[in-house]
Amino acid sequence: MEEAEKPAALDLQKLLNTRIVVHIRDGRKLNGTLTQYDEYMNMLLEDVDETMGDKPANKYKILVVKGGNVQAISI
């Protein structure tokens, strides 16, 4: 019996070139455009607004997010 391909919990392909909010384990939120990702959920975001709690923190033109630091993703 062949093993069926497992569906991904989150299909990042559908979110490419879309603004998303990445919730980081340390409480930060990154609001940016998803331009690339890999099988480890490492992501490249562009035009990123970082917030800590409700306070704006930083702005980044390009930011790499390590998949292991991601708690959740919302759109």
Predicted features and spans:
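Conserved RNA-binding domains used in RNP assembly and mRNA/RNA metabolism
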Residues: 1-75
